[in-house]
Amino acid sequence: MTTPIYLATDFYKLSHREQYPEGTTKVYSTLTPRSNKYAPWSDEIVFFGLQYFIKEYLIDRFNDEFFSQPLEDVISTYETFVKNTLGKTEVYTEHLVQLHNLGYLPIKIEALPEGTLAPMRCPVMTIENTQPEFFWLTNFLETILSTTIWQPITSATLAYQYRKVLDDYAIKTTGSTAGVEFQGHDFSLRGMSSEQSGMASGMGHLTSFQGTDTIPAIFGVHKYYKAPLDFTTGASISATEHSVMCSYGQADELELFKHLLVDVYPTGLFSVVSDTWDFWKVVTEYLPALKNIIMSRDGKLVVRPDSGDPVDIVTGTKQNGTTPEEKGLIECLWDTFGGTVNKQGYKVLNSHIGAIYGDSINLERATAISERLEAKGFATTNIVFGIGSFSYQYHTRDTFGFAVKATAATVDGEERMLFKDPKTDDGTKRSQRGRIVVARKEDVLAENPEFDFSTLTGDQSNNELLWKDGLNETEVNQSSWNALRPVFQDGQLLVDDSLATIRERLANERSKQEVVQEETQLHKHLKDTIIDRWSKTN
C-alpha cells in the first residue's frame, strides 16, 4: 500500500502541533532556493512543478485518501501507526477529526507564475493556514511539498541552461534557433530513481524542449498542465538498441543497416546505434557503401554513437585532423554526404543524414561540443544531444539549497517575525523574517518611476526580481506589485496554467536576457577543460 497522505511526512512533524506556543493561530512559510554553491552553472532557477504538487497531493490525494474516507478508518490507521512506531499509549487525533469534518485543506498558497526565472535567495512561494485551529498544517505539509517540487524545478533549470547554450550557438552558427526545441532530447528515465521522479524531472525538461524519450513526462504534463498528447508536447523517433544490432550478428551489420533503410523504414526519420562493434568502420565503410540508398530516401538516418569520449567522438581529437578519430563524426559525415554552407558561413549536413549522442552528456560536454563544432566551421545544430540521467539524476535538493522555512507566526493575536541565523553556518541557512513581497522591476517602475530599489533585496543591476521581508500581513496586503499571486486556497485551485503558457513565459524571460556572444558564465566555469585541451593539441 502507499502511505496515506495524512502520514506522508517526517516522523517529527507528527509532534510539532503540540510544541508550538499556546495561542498560536497562524504559521506562514516560504520556499526559497538558498544557494547555487553546488550549481555554479546557474545563478537562477526556473520555477516549475507547483501546479503538479497542488493537483496531485493537495487536491487528488487528500480528497481520495482522507476527506472521502470514513473518519473512523482514518483515525484507526493513524492511531495504530503512531502507537506502534512512536510508543504512544494515548494518541491525540482531534486535529485530524476537525480537518476531516471541515472537508477541505484550509491552506493558502501564493507563488510566482510557473516558468518565471528567480535568483538565488528569492522566495518563490508562500504557504499559510487560513483558519486559526489549523496552524499546525502549514509546516506539516513541508515534507511532501519539498520532496515533490525540488526535482522538477532543478531539472527545468538545467534544461533551461542547456537551451540557453544551444540557442546561443545556434544563433551564432545558423542565424536562428529553429530546431533547437528538438536538439535537447530527454534520455533520462531508465537512470532516474523511479518512474515518478522520471516523470517529474521529464516534465521540467519539457518546459524548454520537445524532444523526449520519457513517455511518463508527456502523460504528466497532459494531466497536470493541460498539454495535448501529441508532438507539440513531446516527440521522438524510431530507434534501434544494442539488442537489435546483436541479434543480427556482427557479420551482418551492413545488411542490417540496409534492411532498416529499405524494408523497415523506407521513409521518415530513424536512429541506429552504431558502436555495437566498430563505430569508425560503420562511419567510414558502411555508410559510404549505403550512400545512394540514404540519399534517395525520403527521410533521415540518424547515427548514434554510444561510447567513448562524447566530445572527441562527435568533434574529433584535433581541429584539423586527417584520420576519422581526429576528424570526429560530424566532419566524417560531411566528407561522405556533404551538405550546404549557410549565410553565416557554417556547414550544415545534408538533410538525409544526422547524428545524436546520448551517453554521459552533461552541460559542460554539450558546451564543449558546440564550441568545437563552431571552431571547425560546422553549424552546432548538426548534433542532437541525448540528455540522460548523467545530467538529471546527478542533483539533489541541495543543488539549489531549497528549503521551506517558517518566517511569520501569529501568537495570542500578535504577529511575530520568525527567522533562523545559525552562528555555525556560513550564512546559507539564514532565513528571511516576517512576511515577504517579491517585486518585478518593470511592475514597480510602471507604478513609481522614482522608486528607491535600495530598499529591496537582490542584485540591483541584473535581477528582474527583488524582494522585501520583515513585513506584516497588512503591509503585504497593501502592496500593489507583489509578484507572488494566489494559486490555491481552501481546497480550490485558483490558477490552472497550461504547458504552452509556461513555455511562452519562460521564452519571454529568455528574450529579456541578452544573447551572449562572448565568454559565458559556463565558459568561465569550465576553465582548463576539454575545450582548452583540444585547442592545445592543434
List the predicted regions and their residue ranges.
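Buried, small/hydrophobic-residue-enriched core segments of structured protein domains
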Residues: 2-40, 78, 86, 91-93, ...
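Aromatic- and Gly/Pro-rich amphipathic surface segment
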Residues: 49-90
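Gly/Ser/Thr/Ala-enriched C-terminal appendages of enzymes
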Residues: 2-61, 209-210, 214-215, 220-228, ...
